[in-house]
């Protein structure tokens, strides 16, 4: 629903909110509905899992603004997208152990890699409007950065036999 930037990027300006097909109040209503359904599911789990799930909302809430603050918004995306690894352990084991943390960090590295690739399609528009990303940060050296992030992901995931 942060449409200011979406309306200024070629790839995203035709999305429903920037294109005017869905209003911000309609999107907020849908968000509230989804949040209530998610909360109903979350409350079925143990207390530790509920707290872990609620904690994820901080990262989810700040992510859309990170591209204005840091060259590393893909890290914050990785923290958010990979949170499910922590949730799985929280639900099943009632806690988070070293295996969960290794899975989490390995998944974050994987997300940084694929979202860096994805961000390259918007790099020109992003530069014009001041949006930061690892794609812009790495530029021509992206392939070397991807070797590092995907290499780290493979190493970490292999340590836990995934």
Task: Indicate residue ranges for each PLM-predicted region.
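Short, small-residue-biased leader/transition segments that mark boundaries at the very start
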Residues: 1-3, 162
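Cysteine-centered, disulfide-bonded loop motifs in secreted/extracellular proteins
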Residues: 4-6, 83
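Multi-pass membrane catalytic core of lipid/isoprenoid biosynthesis enzymes
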Residues: 7-53, 128-160
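Intramembrane alpha-helical segments
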Residues: 15-102
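Single, functionally critical "micro-switch" positions that shape active/binding sites
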Residues: 22, 72, 114, 121, ...
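Membrane-embedded alpha-helices of multi-pass transport/permease systems
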Residues: 48, 112-124, 128-131
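Alpha-helical transmembrane segments of multi-pass membrane proteins
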Residues: 60-64, 106-114, 118
């Amino acid at each position: 629903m942060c449409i200011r930037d979406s309306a200024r990027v070629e790839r995203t300006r035709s999305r429903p909110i920037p294109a005017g097909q869905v209003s911000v109040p309609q999107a907020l209503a849908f968000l509230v509905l989804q949040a209530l359904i998610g909360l109903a599911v979350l409350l079925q789990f143990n207390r530790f899992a509920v707290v872990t799930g609620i904690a994820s909302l901080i990262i989810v809430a700040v992510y859309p603004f990170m591209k204005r603050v840091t060259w590393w918004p893909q890290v914050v995306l990785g923290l958010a997208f990979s949170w499910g690894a922590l949730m799985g352990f929280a639900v099943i084991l009632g806690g988070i152990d070293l295996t969960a943390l290794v899975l989490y960090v390995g998944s974050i590295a994987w997300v940084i890699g694929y979202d860096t690739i994805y961000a390259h399609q918007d790099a020109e528009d992003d530069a014009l409007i001041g949006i930061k990303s690892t794609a812009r940060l790495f530029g021509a050296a992206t392939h070397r950065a991807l070797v590092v992030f995907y290499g780290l992901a493979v190493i970490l995931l292999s340590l836990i036999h995934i």
